[in-house]
Design a protein with these regions (language model features):
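Conserved functional micro-motifs across diverse proteins
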Residues: 1-173
Length: 173
């Protein structure tokens, strides 16, 4: 069974040797070019998606509108995505030992931001890679420093894993 990553984790792509992706930098932040009028009353946050090539060959990468899905709160409601303030990876060649990072600005009700799920559907050399998901939340540290951060990561990761196992068991029962 596929389990989501915790925000901050790297995810390898087996079919593309050396290529890996990471969702990180999830924190409250106002957008650089001002708030969108449609996000009135919502709390803004940002996140980063970094693609790294540790392999011997070049990969053409696309990470654009519609390839990122951000869900918030216990019911997984869609976050408001501020495309105007976000920066994507559009047709970029990642050579060996290089990285490219997309920055996404989103917003939602502040109470729902304790749980944020980010799904990434990367396009590599004109082919769609498998979707990958990361789970995190505002207020949780991702760098793993200190015992409190380790407990927060393990707690969220365990909650997500246990929930998904329970759903899978219900489906097979």
């Amino acid at each position: 069974m596929y389990e989501p990553n915790v925000v901050g984790d790297w995810q390898e792509y087996d079919e593309h040797a050396g290529l890996r992706v990471r969702v990180h930098g999830l924190h409250a932040q106002e957008p650089p070019r001002g708030r969108d009028a449609a996000a009135e009353g919502l709390a803004y946050f940002s996140l980063r998606v970094t693609v790294e090539n540790r392999g011997p060959e070049r990969f053409g990468i696309h990470l654009e509108d519609g390839q990122l899905d951000v869900r918030i709160g216990p019911d997984g409601e869609s976050a408001f995505l501020d495309w105007r303030n976000s920066q994507f990876i559009e047709g970029y060649d990642i050579y060996p030992l290089r990285r490219a990072t997309a920055v996404l600005f989103a917003a939602g009700p502040e109470a729902a931001l304790a749980r944020v799920d980010i799904q990434v559907h990367l396009r590599i050399d004109e082919e769609w890679a498998d979707r990958r998901m990361w789970s995190g939340g505002l207020g949780l540290q991702e760098d793993g420093t200190g015992p409190a951060a380790a407990t927060a990561h393990e707690g969220l990761a365990c909650q997500v894993s246990n929930f998904l196992r329970g759903q899978a068991e219900e489906g097979t029962a």
